Amino acid sequence: MRLKVEALTAEKKVNGRKRHIVTDTQGHLLHVKSHPTNEHDSISGCVVFEEALTKYPALQGVCADGGYRGTFVDYVRLALECLVDVVLKLPEGWTILPKRWVVERTLSWLNGSRRLSKDYEISTDSSETQVKLSHIHLLLRRLFHL
């Protein structure tokens, strides 16, 4: 029997899951975490960054968007003793936010993968694995210019 975790976001009432990624400054994937949509970004961001910090102890700071304010910022600054830079959207019009753009670009590269374009996976572990495989495929294509 297959169990599918379903949850709705508070704002958009969308069923599915969220992906949190940690990238380096060039947009290369360091860590990925997938969870149901009913968990807030600032709470799950703490778990994601702590896991990334254990894998990569040289991490000194993090740039995050406005959804990670509050709990995440306090936890990373106090408990993990890392720098946090929250990049907020500007109220007037559309503009490129350089630090945030790195992660958005990585997500768009990953969404080019057919398997990630929709939420086909049942478990969050297999969803995370598909993200990693898609990134490996992307890196190999760039390495060999295919």
Language model regions located:
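Polybasic low-complexity intrinsically disordered regions
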Residues: 1-83, 88, 134
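Basic, amphipathic alpha-helical segments enriched in Lys/Arg and hydrophobic/aromatic residues
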Residues: 20, 70, 74, 80, ...
